[in-house]
Every structure is written in structure tokens, then in C-alpha cells.
Amino acid sequence: MDIFKHHESQVQSYANHFPVLFGTAKGSWLYSQQGDAYLDFLSGAGALNYGHNNAVLKQALLEYIERDGLTHGLDMHSEAKAHFIQALQTHILEPRGLNYKLQFTGPTGTNAVEAALKLARKVTGRHNVVTFTNGFHGCSLGALAATGNQHHRQGAGLALSGVYRVPYDGYAGVDGLTLFETMLQDNSSGLDKPAAVLLETVQGEGGLNVASDAWLQRVQAICRAQQILLIVDDIQAGCGRTGTFFSFEPSGIEPDMVTLSKSLSGYGLPMALVLFKPEWDQWKPGEHNGTFRGNNHAFVTATRALEAYWANQDFQTHIAARSEQVTQALLQCLSRYPTLFSGLKGRGLMQGLACHNGDIARDIAALCFQKGLIIETAGAEDEVLKVFCPLTITEADLAHGLTIIERVLLE
């Protein structure tokens, strides 16, 4: 462990909370070099929805590598990319009646957010962007400007501008959308008409805050009335995490742009994508690019994930069952320990318990780790204990992890 202490920057964070040298991982489990097993309720912060080393995805990747399939090709056409595009159309976009162009921005979610913001500003000719309290969109400067958390914002080293923040659904009891709509109509409000509104339907890092369907529909109505682009950041809440492939599906909205990353590749490989309506495809060739925007290994595993898990309703039924299992367990904790918890947060398999303060949540997470459960906190003060297991987790493994939480609370 000394090699990390001596040579790696202290900017690392997860390693501080989980100070173990990991060697292997399979499904919902990680194993240390000493052979200790840890159940994963973190899932690579949402990058491992299909679990560690998923056998179906691994086999597809190994076969592709074995036949010397193209690894790196910038944005050139490749067989792997063609198969992914077709799978996305067949299993995701067409069944949902969605018509989007695809831009591969690679390799991370913040790259997708930056590209979406840049394109929105280009096509509207406006610079301002509206985001929401407790939102998180990445740590590069444009995405960071749209992020609310001061811990991350203070790392910028310069002023973050071009963003106006509005209260999220339920924030401090404020009707943020009435405020937003009123300011748009008032020439003296000081609000420059925005190019776009950027939001998460469930705020992952912000504390598992959930926007209601009615609130999302109202946001879309405001955007359409004012010719403002609506961008949904589905980097953490997408790819099935809330129960449907896109987190916004239950609301019936149709964003102008959607950003995806994390579990898009299915295997934890770097991959990011912006979906946008065809009329917004106004880039000039090469106007926005990136060296690693064509990760063919990620295309291979992403394609296989779509074919294996999204060709029918079985996987969504599984997610719904496991989500209900989590909900019932957390509700029991909430009722039994009112001195620790103040509420249930999130939906789908991104749920958690709001603690009365961050110290409680951090202590519970630390004690869970001592008992073999990797779980993190979220929220402005790290006050939410965040259950974020792989979507493929078995009923038995999920019950085991929830039992560890209960044991910690009993102690």
C-alpha cells in the first residue's frame, strides 16, 4: 500500500474510504489480495450496472480481441461501432419512439456534458445555461460550472460562469419553476435567456433527490415555450439504474439532448455519448473531437449488453423486484431508527436513507465496510447512505448486503 501513499496524488478519494488492495472481482463481489470478500453496493459509482466481469460481456470482448478487432480508430467507421449503433436503434430508441443523432465524445461523462453544452450554445447563439441546486455534472470547467457542490467547485482555480442556478424540485420548499418562468418573462430580472436547461431526473451525487413527473413535464413545457433546449444528464441515473433504460421515460418527456456514460459500455470501459434531435446536428466536421471518442472495445460490450438485457422486459422486471426489496428494507430501517434517519431517498436501484447529519452516514458506511460491504454516501453534507448495487445482483446477495446494514444499526 505504500506505493500509493508515496507516489499517487492525495486527490484520490474512494481509496481513502476503502483502504484495501483489491485483486479480483466477479458479479456483485470484489476480493482483496488477501482473499477477503466485499459485497459491492457502489458499482463503480454507476459504471458497473451489469456487475464485475459479466460473463456474457466478457466473452464478447475476448472473442473480439482474439480476432484482432480494431481497438482505436478515432471516429472512423468500424464494425464494432456499426453494431452498437444498430443495437441502440433496435433495442432502445425505436421501441421508445425516439429519434436521436449520436455523438461519441469519449471517454467520460463530463466529456458528454461539455459537448452538449457547447452544441446548445452554438445552435442557439446564447451563452447562459440554467442548472439546479445540488446538481452534479462533472469536474471539467464547463461541467463544473453547472455543478452545485462547493467541494468540487473550489477545485476549479478560477471563476465559474455562464450558469444560473434554480431550485430543484422540492428544494427548501421553494417553487423554483414559477421563479424561473417569472424571471424569463421579466426583462429586469437579470436572467439572460439560456441556451439550455441541464438537469438530472434523480440527483445521484446531490443526495438522491427525485424530480416528480409533473415537475419534469413542466420544465419541458417552459423550455418549449421559450425555445430553450432541454438536456437530461442521464450519466448516473440512466442505463437501467432507475428501472427503465432512460430515467426520464416514466415522465413522458422527450429531451432535446441526453448525455450517457458510466454503464453505457456495460463492462466498466470508458465510453460517453450525446444523443440529440436531428435538427440540432449543426456541427461542422471536426468542430468538436477527442482522441478517445471511438472505444471499439466499449462498443463491443455495449452492444452485447443491449442485446442480452434490453431485448425484452425481463431485465426491467428483475430491476423492479430488486428495487422493491431495497425499498422495503430501507423503510424498516427508517421506522426502527428515527433518531438516525429522516427519510427515504431515490428510486429504482439508486435509493438511500437520509441521515440527520453527515457524521451518522459516514460512520454507518465505515462500519459496513468493516463487515464486508462497500457503500458510499451522497448529498451536500454526505448525509445520505446510498445503496447502489449492480442491477444484476441476486435476491440473496442483495439481502445479505441489506442485512449487513441492519447489523451495523443494531450495534
Swiss-Prot record:
The metabolic or biological pathway listed in the UniProt record of this protein is: Amine and polyamine biosynthesis; ectoine biosynthesis; L-ectoine from L-aspartate 4-semialdehyde: step 1/3
Kindly report, in one word, the top-level EC class recorded for this enzyme.
transferase
- Signal peptide per UniProt: none
Say if the entry is tagged with keyword Iron: no
Q: Does the keyword Transferase apply?
A: yes
Tell me its EC number(s), please.
2.6.1.76
GO biological process per UniProt: ectoine biosynthetic process
Q: Which domain of life is it from?
A: Bacteria
CDD domains, A to Z? OAT_like
Q: Name one GO molecular function term.
A: diaminobutyrate-2-oxoglutarate transaminase activity
Keywords assigned by UniProt? Aminotransferase, Pyridoxal phosphate, Transferase
PANTHER family, per database record = DIAMINOBUTYRATE--2-OXOGLUTARATE AMINOTRANSFERASE (PTHR43552), DIAMINOBUTYRATE--2-OXOGLUTARATE TRANSAMINASE (PTHR43552:SF2)
- Record NCBIfam families: dat, ectoine_ectB, PRK09264.1
Q: Which family does it belong to?
A: Belongs to the class-III pyridoxal-phosphate-dependent aminotransferase family.
UniProt name for this protein? Diaminobutyrate--2-oxoglutarate transaminase
Q: Which organism is it from?
A: Vibrio cholerae serotype O1 (strain ATCC 39315 / El Tor Inaba N16961)
